[in-house]
Amino acid sequence: MADAPNQKWAGDISYVWTREGWIYLAVILDLHSRRVIGWAVSNRMKRDLAIRALKMAIAFRQPPNGCIHHTDRGSQYCSHDYQKLLRQHGFKISMSGKGNCYDNAAVETFFKTIKAELIWRYPWETRRKAEMAIFEYINGFYNPRRKHSALGWKSPVAFERKVA
């Protein structure tokens, strides 16, 4: 993991079924606290989805040069525009070994958690309803209130406050 905020970030994309079709969720986590610091939803899994999540994280955290940014080797993360944005902000780029999902375990765990606690519990009528529920889950529950055993049973926000 990381000893302090803004040392290591990780990102990935997952999907959610609605009666209108799929939506895709891109997230960026700070690996120190497991806090979701950037996220975006779209009905297409294109590079702009990943870029929007990264831009949100950058605007929110303003990371120092040398912050490690880890993802898998998906086309969105390998794209010229995404890589350029990382370089412009001084990130040290890290990518998973080919076909190794365990390299990004923290983000995969987040997706497992949001799916078990929210996504799989309801039949999502519309993409918009799913997106709003994801917003509420991340900002109203996961970051400020969801306790993690790895964080000494603190939420990501409380864990970061303790460090500050």
Which role fits each region the language model picked out?
Residues 1-164:
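Charged DNA-binding/catalytic regions of mobile-element recombinases
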